[in-house]
Structures are given as structure tokens and as C-alpha cells.
A protein has these predicted regions:
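Non-catalytic accessory segments of hydrolases
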Residues: 1-133
Length: 133
């Protein structure tokens, strides 16, 4: 089921988690402008607000990193990389008012870390009463 929320940048459309309909998931939310062109090798710049409903129902591509055959077991079949990779995912109970926010930084030693890793599905952890980023 789709779920829409308003952010400082505009409206975002997420969805219910496949394993828990009471859990909202927002995938591929931009947290900075893509570091491309004149922004390459510069500090991240704020995201420009949008006026249309932003679909947050798909993971973004991971950043470029060293290729590791072992890491691809957890890749969900995504083998592409992109410099346009400044996105995050959020798992949240439906009633998230006043819940603590937990930020998870995945590992991977720059050889196999990405937000869409099968091991990093945040549904269960958010179900314990946190908003997981």
C-alpha cells in the first residue's frame, strides 16, 4: 500500500513493508544534490525542493567501489554503480511521532556496502520502536 508524507523538500510516496503492513518504507530519498559536473569533488549541496510527488519506492544505485564477488551475494541482483548515489532509505512505524531516530551506516570496507543489501532491511529493527535511516 502506498503512503505519502510531506518533507521539507516536498511530498514523498513510500509504501508499506512487504512483511509488515504497519511499517512504512521510503527508499531512495535524496539527501544531497548528485555530485556530478561542477559539484564533483565538492562538499554536498542541499537537495532542491520538488513540486511533484517524489516516488520513494526503489533503492538507488550504490556508489562506485572496489568489486568484490563475495559481496554480490547480498546485492539483490543489482550490479551497477553510479556517482549519483547520495540517497538514503527510511523504515518507520505508521505512528512515528516522538520516536527516536537511529542512523545506520553500513560497512563493507569500500568493497561491498550499499543501502539495498539484503542484510540491511530495517523492517524488524524499526518495529522495535525507532525510525531507522
Amino acid at each position: 500500500m502506498k503512503t505519502n508524507i510531506e518533507t521539507a523538500q516536498g511530498w514523498v510516496a513510500g509504501e508499506s513493508a512487504a512483511t509488515d503492513p504497519a511499517m512504512r518504507v521510503f527508499r531512495g530519498l535524496p539527501y544531497a544534490q548528485p555530485p556530478l559536473g561542477d559539484l564533483r569533488w565538492k562538499p554536498p549541496q542541499p537537495v532542491e525542493p520538488w513540486t511533484d510527488l517524489h516516488a520513494a519506492d526503489a533503492f538507488s544505485l550504490p556508489c562506485w567501489q572496489t568489486h568484490s564477488e563475495d559481496a554480490f551475494v547480498w546485492s539483490r541482483g543489482v550490479f551497477e554503480r553510479s556517482e549519483d548515489c547520495l540517497y538514503l532509505n527510511v523504515w518507520s512505524p505508521e505512528d512515528a511521532d516522538h520516536l527516536p531516530v537511529m542512523v545506520w551506516f553500513h560497512g563493507g570496507a569500500h568493497t561491498g556496502g550499499w543501502g539495498h543489501n539484503l542484510l540491511f532491511d530495517g523492517t524488524n529493527l524499526a518495529g522495535l520502536g525507532v525510525v531507522l535511516v
